[in-house]
Amino acid sequence: LESPIGTNPLHPKVVQSPAMRLFDSVKERIGTHEEFPHVGTTYRLTEHFQFWTKSVKLLMIAQPQQFIEIGEELAKEKGIAKGDWVKVSSKRGWIKAKAVVTKRMMPLQINGKTVHQIGIPLHGGWVNVSGEKQFIVNTLTPFVGDCNTQTPEYKTFLVNIEKA
């Protein structure tokens, strides 16, 4: 749905999949690479089982808090250090979490442009078992799906990141 370079090098006349299901209410909430230059990607952690994390005390002990993974190069560029609170935003909303600066999130070279990835684990819900406010990652994700299966696309989307 959203392109970190604003185009599709393999098919320049088509940026978005013509086979996706795009609801009218979503059309004005599509991010651009100028406003949201980084790619957010969601994933689960070993300690998580679906969304049980927020209500099972043992899982909250193992993984107590939402975090964001960013690469060393992007962290340096943004002045973000390990443990800093960061705000990650998309055209649809924003979340706050602690930053984890890592070598795992390396920048990509796409059509001659450096594109940074931001890892955003799916974590808990609005309030965890200890009563702390949490943020829902799906606040950032687009509401679009595959035209045949209606499976939503929550995996990648455009974001920006800044110190909170």
Q: Where in this protein do the model-derived segments appear?
A:
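Long, contiguous, secondary-structure-rich segments that constitute the structural scaffold
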Residues: 3, 7-8, 35, 51-164
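Long, low-complexity segments enriched in small/aliphatic residues
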Residues: 1-55
